[in-house]
A protein has these predicted regions:
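Phosphate-end processing signature that detects enzymes handling 5′-triphosphorylated RNA
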Residues: 1-179
Length: 179
């Protein structure tokens, strides 16, 4: 278990995009409901996804993230300002591919890793498909009061705003398809 401390910002993509000279990965994320913990097993849809001796508690979001051929199951606790508890487990790609994920809330994005003037790593996500054109940048911090040199291309800060998490965005997409 760890504590994630991050700040998130909208980006106006009509301006220069200096992050595009950086390395990137393509990411697929889907969000699960009904995840259960029983006798050391984290289960969803009758399938054991991971094992852990300690039961994750107060979890608000369960996510599976696919990058290349790696899959990480993440459990996130309730966000309080810029902080949230976070648990992660690697799961085999074969297991992920066997799961019924096509109807789950999901997002696709390209993530660029850009180094700021202060040496902090910014993750700049350019969303795809239904969210094409949306760009969000986030920076992980060691403490909530850590000083950050904000790049000039950042827009509105989203850190404390509800509805801007990737999980919320994925639900918005899923809900819009139910018409």
């Amino acid at each position: 278990m760890g504590v994630e401390i991050e700040r998130r910002f909208l980006i106006d993509g009509r301006e220069e995009k200096p992050w595009r000279t950086s390395d990137f990965v393509d990411i697929f994320q889907c969000y699960l409901s009904g995840v259960r913990y029983h006798d050391g097993e984290i289960m969803w849809n009758g399938v054991t996804l991971a094992r852990d001796e300690i039961a994750p508690t107060n979890i608000t979001t369960w996510r599976m993230r696919v990058v290349d051929n790696g899959v990480v199951l993440t459990a996130k606790g309730k966000r309080v300002g810029a902080m949230a508890e976070e648990f992660e487990w690697d799961i085999p790609i074969e297991l992920f591919n066997s799961l019924p994920t096509s109807d789950l809330p999901s997002i696709k994005k390209r993530r660029y890793n850009w180094n700021g003037a202060d040496g902090l790593l910014w993750e700049v996500d350019e969303f795809e498909d239904s969210l094409a054109g949306l760009i969000i940048a986030e920076v992980e911090l060691d403490s909530v009061d850590q000083s950050v040199d904000l790049p000039p291309w950042l827009g509105m800060e989203l850190t404390n705003l509800r509805g801007w998490s990737n999980a919320s965005l994925s639900m918005m997409i899923k809900d819009s398809r139910l018409d």
